[in-house]
Amino acid sequence: MSVESAENNIRGVPTHGGRYLQYNIYGNLFEVSRKYVPPIRSVGRGAYGIVCAAVNAETREEVAIKKIGNAFDNRIDAKRTLREIKLLRHMDHENVMSIKDIIRPPQKENFNHVYIVSELMDTDLHQIIRSNQPMTDDHCRYFVYQLLRGLKYVHSANVLHRDLKPSNLLLNANCDLKIGDFGLARTTSETDFMTEYVVTRWYRAPELLLNCSDYTAAIDIWSVGCILGEIVTRQPLFPGRDYVHQLRLVTELIGSPDDASLGFLRSENARRYVRQLPQYPKQNFSARFPNMSPGAVDLLEKMLIFDPSKRIKVDEALCHPYMAPLHDINEEPVCARPFSFDFEEPMFTEEDIKELIWKESVRFNPDPPIN
């Protein structure tokens, strides 16, 4: 017997005594617990693999299932997966993606693929910006407010996202926004530089472009500013071809920093490098963004500041006059306890990480699987 998806005729084949169903989605095999039933459809793919929508037969809600294939082939990818699972399980906020399940593998010894189940969203901000759907100033305010509201919670958990960009901001038809993809997140106290992954350059703060290792939560605020500008102009603010071009685009808009603004750079080489760059005056933001409301322009100027210590903080941004129609301090919760990355031991092997992800799946599914 097979379970069939009416929508596109994707059939589920029972495996492991009927405890699991296997779906073939455009050549990708998905083996999931039997409670995840048709209609099954592909809703996206990325470097990590493929995402499908399915229905949880127990709750009748549609969910997203992300398959991370061969998740333990290298330590960096495996660590990223574990980090995201642990972080999202720790978080509980309307504007942060939540994990509903880690599908427990049928056999621990054959555990190679990780399936993360989360709420299903309709689209992401990148898709909306690139579409021809009209966006008003109210849309812009609502998107940025929710982003800041979620970020306040994330930062209060002692976590930096480090990779905020439109495609990581998930939306549904009501314009509700959730921050996703925490695979690059770090604690605010860590000072390791991002050697593992190439974070999208266009949304990176100047201190990261200049290899500053002791960065702060201000890196995420810079990214919010880039996103705010992109919502209004529907073009990336700083689409740099490389780091040098990226820094030039930044200084062409916000002006070249003076010496006082370079205090955060500990490296004399970095300061010397910035000083020898072509000098640009700051542009008039109102002229540069004629379609942006004055309040949004003012907030943008406070986010796009070269010196991270002078950049507006997330709490201050929520209190900014532009956010006044939505801001309510009592509806902007913080995280009850800080998140700890203690599980990330430097000596961890792929097998150690596999064991920890296995334990996460057992936490969601305590019943032993059929072998």
From Swiss-Prot:
Organism whose genome encodes this protein: Medicago sativa (Alfalfa)
Phosphotyrosine PTM positions: Y197
Enzyme Commission (EC) number: 2.7.11.24
InterPro entries: Kinase-like_dom_sf, MAP_kinase, MAP_kinase_CS, Prot_kinase_dom, Protein_kinase_ATP_BS, Ser/Thr_kinase_AS
Gene assigned in the entry: MMK2
Protein keywords: ATP-binding, Kinase, Nucleotide-binding, Phosphoprotein, Serine/threonine-protein kinase, Transferase
A Pfam family matched in the record: Pkinase
PROSITE patterns listed in its UniProt record: MAPK, PROTEIN_KINASE_ATP, PROTEIN_KINASE_DOM, PROTEIN_KINASE_ST
Name used for this protein in its record: Mitogen-activated protein kinase homolog MMK2
Entry-linked CDD domains: STKc_TEY_MAPK
Domain Protein kinase: 37-323
Motif (TXY): 195-197
